[in-house]
Amino acid sequence: MKVFINTLIADLFLKLYTSVGWIVSYKEQVERALENTLALFMAYEDDKPVGMVRILGDSGMSFYIKGFAVIPKYQGKGIGKLLISEVQNYILSIIDKDWSVSLELISTKEGVKFYKKNGFEERLCEWDGPGMFKMIKNISNLISD
């Protein structure tokens, strides 16, 4: 198994992204997202892309996992764990000594067990609220009277 950083192109991203059931409407949207990504990690087995993770963040206090996918037939083989490890090592390599930073994500229901096994904690707790998100759609064909 090999992991490469910052080698992901839109076509590979789309292949992996859709392999886990996610939908993207526009290749141009993916290209822009990749251009503005802090770091990209791609896992290969026998020169075949089998997993990826994209990292967003400010490089100082907060990092965010987005687009974490492993092709279903390769799940359960340690690829996700390897990618999480690579992400953590990358973050440690760019932050100053003694800094603490947050690594955050929104999990699917099916992914909660995996993330807990890899050291993540659920946000919903006594002293903090749940993680939240909102989808925003630009509707250019909207006619208003």
Model-derived features: where do they sit?
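Conserved acetyl-CoA pyrophosphate-binding loop and the N-cap/start of the following alpha-helix
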Residues: 74, 78-86
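Active-site rim helix/loop that mediates acceptor-substrate recognition in acyltransferases
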Residues: 18-40, 45
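Short amphipathic alpha-helix that is part of the acyltransferase structural core
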Residues: 1-28, 145
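Small/polar loops that bind or transfer phosphate-bearing groups
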Residues: 5, 66, 106-107
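Active-site beta-strand termini and strand-to-loop segments that position acidic
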Residues: 44-46, 135-137
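Conserved beta-strand in the GNAT
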Residues: 42, 48-57, 61-64, 69
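Conserved active-site alpha-helix within GNAT-family acetyltransferase domains
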Residues: 93-134
